[in-house]
């Protein structure tokens, strides 16, 4: 089983417009609502890839029942921690004239110490059956930056961590198996500009030296890099039609987790994660993956060991 755990789910609105004009009235071609946020996206993606997964998250307000109901319809096993404050609502605007995506992201509401304790209790209960864990998403205001670190300290199996800044730095002490900040998040964590490929790889290997077995940096349609202490890999992504980029990073994490769960070596797991991200890019709703579609993208991805 895979565990997807995180504190920042969202109830997501996806709007399609012919041409977005700021400061004007914009009428939408279509409007969709979906369960989302990193932890939810990972759970949905893993389920679509046919692997058992428990999705652990807090939720409150009107969105709690909506998210729970949709996950049940999708066949996603979940454990929801009741939260006093309402779950955030985020909006994605897809401009079909330019292909650009505009994100209106509400920050997650603070979560109480009692709710965090309940979350950890459920995590530890389900951990007994887990072979891979994905810890993902920003921490709500007031949550200790050590929260992910403390969960990793209790975890006996490989952990994929999608976090940044203080929570990533703290978690490195417990040696997560794989971390996947984006380029900007890595710069923020290291507090330095990574202006070229050489600087980027050196920055990634600093994170390896500080505890992460693998570091993965995706850059959208550009090269993805992966490093361990001994090796550097360059991956050239597949070409895919852009419909909605939301949850591509989460699909990458889910694809890697599923491949590791199936015993694949890390470079191949990353390749399969990239195929999942490419498939997600072509879908309107987040993380609704198909292994059949993914195979086409998998075959296009180029992998080169640099060191």
Identify the role of each PLM range.
Residues 27-87, 300:
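Substrate-binding N-lobe of the ribokinase-like
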Residues 3, 54, 134, 160-162, ...:
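Structural detector of well-ordered beta-strand residues that form the stable sheet scaffold
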Residues 169, 197-307:
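Conserved phosphate-binding/catalytic region of the ribokinase-like
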């Amino acid at each position: 089983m895979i565990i997807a755990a995180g504190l920042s789910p969202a109830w997501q609105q996806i709007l399609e417009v012919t041409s977005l004009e700021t400061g004007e009235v914009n009428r939408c071609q279509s409007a969709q609502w979906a369960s989302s946020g990193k932890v939810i996206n990972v759970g949905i993606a893993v389920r679509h890839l046919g692997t058992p997964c428990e999705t652990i998250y807090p939720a409150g307000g009107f969105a709690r029942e909506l998210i729970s109901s949709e996950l049940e319809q999708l066949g996603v096993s979940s454990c929801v921690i009741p939260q006093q404050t309402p779950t955030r609502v985020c909006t994605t605007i897809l401009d079909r004239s330019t292909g650009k995506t505009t994100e209106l992201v509400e920050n997650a509401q603070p979560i109480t110490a009692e709710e965090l304790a309940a979350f950890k209790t459920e995590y530890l209960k389900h951990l007994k059956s887990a072979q891979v864990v994905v810890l993902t998403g920003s921490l709500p205001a007031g949550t200790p930056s050590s929260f992910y670190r403390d969960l990793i300290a209790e975890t006996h199996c490989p952990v994929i961590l999608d976090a940044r800044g203080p929570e990533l730095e703290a978690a490195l002490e417990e040696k997560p198996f794989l971390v996947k900040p984006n380029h900007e998040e890595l710069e923020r964590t290291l507090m330095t500009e990574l202006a070229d490929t050489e600087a980027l790889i050196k920055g990634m290997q600093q994170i390896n030296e500080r505890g992460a077995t693998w570091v993965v940096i995706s850059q959208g349609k550009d090269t993805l890099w992966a490093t361990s202490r001994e090796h550097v890999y360059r991956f050239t992504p597949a070409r895919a039609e852009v419909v909605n980029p939301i949850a591509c990073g989460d699909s990458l994490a889910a694809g890697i987790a599923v491949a590791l769960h199936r015993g694949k070596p890390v470079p191949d797991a990353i390749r399969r994660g990239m195929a999942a991200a490419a498939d997600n890019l072509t879908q309107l709703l987040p993380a609704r993956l198909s292994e059949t579609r993914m195979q086409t993208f998998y075959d296009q991805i180029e992998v080169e060991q640099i060191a």
